[in-house]
């Protein structure tokens, strides 16, 4: 892990825990090695650094290309491992970069919805993340951030001291159909979309509190 990244993560962790009374649940679920995708909901500009500080491994982020137009913002984003991507989903270069990072054993954070939710609720996933999962074959770790839409709503420049929670789900591998390699056209696109929808479903299953231990059934 690069020294600059480690330093920035430390600052964000201090900010997250002191200003937002932040809590992180199930961070130990992240794989210790190998490439994987972190898939999270997106409701605020606070999300990328807050999700990144919760990860024990260095992560790479997909970020909207328009955020890089200012040279200073672009430099900061790139130093924080952000990769510019076009919102319309047609950025072949960014997709190749994602696949290369995953192939090199890196953790890549993606937002399946493609943009911030306007009201804090989960939105429909786009097929792009499904395509990357299919082409890379890596596992996906669903994660969810709670409260950032209230901490930094749309149109606001300064964050409020609202409590935040980041929670990780179980890593999972998508069960591809037996004939996946033969699929083409609309049938292949349907699988990509189904992968994306499954990821969003698992994100939606996460709740902002610790998991309850399973109760052992008593024998009769």
Language model regions located:
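Catalytic core of membrane glycerolipid acyltransferases/transacylases, capturing the structured
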Residues: 17, 27, 31-89, 97
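Short, basic, glycine/proline-bearing loop/turn elements
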Residues: 11-13, 79-85, 112-116
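N-terminal membrane-anchoring alpha-helices
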Residues: 1-21
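Short gly/ser/thr-rich secondary-structure transition/capping motifs
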Residues: 17-25, 148-150
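Short Gly/charged-rich anion-binding patches and loops
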Residues: 10, 25, 71-72, 96-97, ...
């Amino acid at each position: 892990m690069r020294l600059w990244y480690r330093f920035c993560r430390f600052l964000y962790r201090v900010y997250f825990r002191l200003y937002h009374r932040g809590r992180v649940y199930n961070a130990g679920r992240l794989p210790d090695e190998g490439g994987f995708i972190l898939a999270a909901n997106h409701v605020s500009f606070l999300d990328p650094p807050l999700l990144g500080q919760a990860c024990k491994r260095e992560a790479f982020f997909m970020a909207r290309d328009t955020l890089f137009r200012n040279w200073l913002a672009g430099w900061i984003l790139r130093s924080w491992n952000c990769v510019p991507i076009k919102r319309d989903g047609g950025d072949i270069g960014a997709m190749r970069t994602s696949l290369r990072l995953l192939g090199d054993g890196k953790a890549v954070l993606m937002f399946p919805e493609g943009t911030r939710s306007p009201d804090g609720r989960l939105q429909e996933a786009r097929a792009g993340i499904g395509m990357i999962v299919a082409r890379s074959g890596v596992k996906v770790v669903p994660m969810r951030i709670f409260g950032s839409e209230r901490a930094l709503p749309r149109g606001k420049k300064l964050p409020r001291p609202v409590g935040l929670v980041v929670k990780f789900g179980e890593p999972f591998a998508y069960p591809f159909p037996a004939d996946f390699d033969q699929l083409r056209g609309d049938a292949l696109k349907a699988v990509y979309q189904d992968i994306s929808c499954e990821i969003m479903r698992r994100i939606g299953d996460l709740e902002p509190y610790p998991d309850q231990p399973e109760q052992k059934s008593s024998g009769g």
